Amino acid sequence: MAETEWTPEALSGRYEEIKSCIPQQLEAYARFLREAAPEDLRRWQQIAQDLKLELNLENGRIKYKKEFKPLELPVDICYIRHGKTQGNTEPRVFQGQVDYANNQLTQQGQQQAAAAATKLEAMAAAKEFIPDLLLSSPLLRAVHTAQPFVDANPKPLFRVLPELAEMAFGEWDNRKVAELEKDDPAHLFYLQQNAVIKAKGPHRICCQLWQSPEWLEGKKELPAENFLECLDRQRKALIKVGEIAKELCGPSCGERKPRVAVYGHSMAGAAVSVLLGFGKEDQLGFLGFDGNYIMPNATPTILIPNAKP
């Protein structure tokens, strides 16, 4: 079956049509909540409570509570989202924990990766951020974004950490946003920054086309997670980053914190930003994580809470 060819005009019209269906999407979200298992609702509320976030289940949005404090880590973090891929080029897809051909760096993405390496080298030369350790998501778009810096700078250790993988969109993964039903509550994820909505079914892996099978460890499918669950997973990932850095770099760093450059993704990066107190808020104080709120491609971003400007 031939793929739909989207002209810019047709795509713009489709997105406007989707936006006009927010009331129907909200009705679908209300059904999603009614059908959710009670233990899932409790778990999502517990995640928010543990992270000192205010969760409005009715609209799926989150805010910082007054008592929120950034996650305390024994490391300093510089986060680099991967370079551009076909998957985040219009007509874009939900690009989560997938690693197929369309999820790899484009030529522009490769150029961005090289530019990110140059930028990080300049930051090191200026003593703004000198990495002791480089950690990457196992998805190749992140690994290949790290590669130019790794190749030119052999001194910092480089490791792949599976826990840094992107948010898993389940059955939405690698589906074109424009081709989901216009009343699908999936659209609330990016239209209204809904941190609760998630796909019902998993992503079924096509092993023959998967580009990095070694980290799958035999998995045949990847369950969906919502942004709250991604936050919780990235919290655990950051704690592990601290443990790895202490083990590998602690003796050479002395009294100072090890500095870690993390190569990752848009939603995972947004989660890390929220956890470290750099979450982006709208006019009502709700946290955003997709669309206009995401990190730019291949741009080193220092995320050190309470750091002096």
From Swiss-Prot:
Transmembrane segments: none annotated. The keyword Hydrolase applies. Keywords: Hydrolase. By diethyl pyrocarbonate (DEPC). GO terms for cellular component: cytosol. InterPro entries: His_Pase_superF_clade-1, His_PPase_superfam, Phosphoglycerate_Mutase. One of its GO terms (molecular function) is mannitol-1-phosphatase activity. The keyword Hydrolase applies. GO terms for biological process: mannitol biosynthetic process; negative regulation of glycolytic process; regulation of pentose-phosphate shunt. It catalyses: D-mannitol 1-phosphate + H2O = D-mannitol + phosphate. The active site is at 82 (tele-phosphohistidine intermediate), 166 (proton donor/acceptor). Its EC number is 3.1.3.22. Key enzyme for mannitol biosynthesis. PANTHER family: FRUCTOSE-2,6-BISPHOSPHATASE TIGAR. Belongs to the phosphoglycerate mutase family. This is Mannitol-1-phosphatase. It comes from Eimeria tenella (Coccidian parasite).
